[in-house]
């Protein structure tokens, strides 16, 4: 039996309003629990359109057929008008998710974090995280114990900023296995549970065809030598490619693959490491990557 952490990122208003209820229904049908990370502030995702001037981002949008994948409402959100606030407008949906699944913070403003957090000072970052956590806790009526940085935009600054909130774990980077990042003080920080597997949009049209994706992914899962963690998006697997996700769950069960919330992957003792800026094939720009302590 292979155990895989299932992380669901919710980036947008439509992903929350339409994608999450569909995913909740699917997960209930297959008796699966996951970790769901919500963006709760304004939906300004359309402001990423300026990145089309960057060849790597443009190619990603073209090969993944982004207009069909996400829809024009997502691609234009927050461009010619202020972005709609996601959290309180979809509070019932978020509360329903929290009844059955592990719920954490993805971002206050997903676009702002992904586009600008790399240049923020620490206090700006702490204030932004606090605003998101406060809003999510108001909605679900209980403490939030985990978070996942939007777009995996994380480095030492993010690690230090999140220590102020005493979360159980964060999932801010890409890597191979859970670990504790070293703080500037030399002490181990809050556990990190990295994503180990590629997302749909990172590989479609580059490494694999859409119709072959599930078999390709299951092969990667079964060959994973670390602690497999897979991320889906409410805007993709909860909307245009929900049928593909359902097929993945069916095939995974046949292969002896089970999915679980990320917290079930934690253990009493974890290796030490760091979160450093790096690059991942198929994704434009830098993102946080696991580095084992002592390696370079």
Curated annotation (Swiss-Prot):
Pfam families: Polysacc_deac_1. Keywords: Antibiotic resistance, Hydrolase, Lipid A biosynthesis, Lipid biosynthesis, Lipid metabolism, Lipopolysaccharide biosynthesis. InterPro entries: ArnD, Glyco_hydro/deAcase_b/a-brl, NODB_dom, Polysacc_deacetylase_ArnD. It catalyses: 4-deoxy-4-formamido-alpha-L-arabinopyranosyl di-trans,octa-cis-undecaprenyl phosphate + H2O = 4-amino-4-deoxy-alpha-L-arabinopyranosyl di-trans,octa-cis-undecaprenyl phosphate + formate. GO terms for biological process: 4-amino-4-deoxy-alpha-L-arabinopyranosyl undecaprenyl phosphate biosynthetic process; lipid A biosynthetic process; lipopolysaccharide biosynthetic process; response to antibiotic. Pathway: Glycolipid biosynthesis; 4-amino-4-deoxy-alpha-L-arabinose undecaprenyl phosphate biosynthesis; 4-amino-4-deoxy-alpha-L-arabinose undecaprenyl phosphate from UDP-4-deoxy-4-formamido-beta-L-arabinose and undecaprenyl phosphate: step 2/2; Bacterial outer membrane biogenesis; lipopolysaccharide biosynthesis. Residues 2-260 form the NodB homology domain. GO terms for molecular function: hydrolase activity, acting on carbon-nitrogen (but not peptide) bonds, in linear amides. The keyword Signal does not apply. SUPFAM superfamilies: Glycoside hydrolase/deacetylase. GO terms for cellular component: membrane. Gene3D superfamilies: Glycoside hydrolase/deacetylase (3.20.20.370). Catalyzes the deformylation of 4-deoxy-4-formamido-L-arabinose-phosphoundecaprenol to 4-amino-4-deoxy-L-arabinose-phosphoundecaprenol. The modified arabinose is attached to lipid A and is required for resistance to polymyxin and cationic antimicrobial peptides. Belongs to the polysaccharide deacetylase family. ArnD deformylase subfamily. This is Probable 4-deoxy-4-formamido-L-arabinose-phosphoundecaprenol deformylase ArnD. The lineage of its organism: Bacteria, Pseudomonadati, Pseudomonadota, Gammaproteobacteria, Enterobacterales. The gene is arnD.
């Amino acid at each position: 039996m292979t155990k895989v952490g299932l992380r669901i990122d919710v980036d947008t208003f439509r992903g929350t309003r339409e994608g999450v209820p569909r995913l909740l229904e699917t997960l209930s049908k297959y008796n699966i629990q996951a970790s769901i990370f919500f963006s709760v502030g304004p939906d300004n995702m359309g402001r990423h359109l300026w990145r089309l001037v960057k060849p790597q981002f443009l190619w990603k949008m073209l090969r993944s057929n982004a207009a069909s994948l996400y829809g024009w409402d997502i691609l234009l959100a927050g461009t010619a008008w202020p972005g709609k606030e996601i959290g309180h407008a979809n509070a019932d949906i978020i509360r329903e998710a929290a009844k059955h699944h592990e719920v954490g913070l993805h971002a206050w403003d997903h676009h702002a974090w992904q586009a600008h957090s790399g240049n923020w000072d620490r206090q700006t970052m702490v204030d932004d995280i606090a605003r998101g956590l406060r809003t999510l806790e108001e909605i679900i009526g209980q403490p939030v114990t985990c978070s996942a940085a939007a777009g995996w935009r994380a480095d030492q600054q993010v690690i230090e900023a999140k220590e102020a909130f005493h979360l159980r774990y964060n999932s801010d980077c890409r890597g191979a296995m859970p670990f504790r990042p070293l703080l500037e003080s030399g002490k181990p920080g809050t556990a990190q549970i990295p994503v180990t597997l590629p997302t749909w949009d990172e590989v479609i049209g580059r490494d694999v065809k859409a119709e072959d994706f599930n078999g390709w992914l299951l092969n990667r899962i079964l060959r994973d030598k670390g602690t497999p963690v897979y991320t889906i998006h409410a805007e993709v697997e909860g909307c245009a490619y929900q049928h593909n996700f359902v097929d993945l769950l069916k095939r995974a069960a046949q292969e002896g693959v089970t999915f679980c919330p990320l917290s079930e992957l934690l253990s009493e003792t974890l290796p030490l490491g760091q979160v450093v800026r790096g690059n991942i094939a198929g994704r434009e720009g830098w993102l946080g990557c696991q580095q084992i302590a002592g390696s370079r």
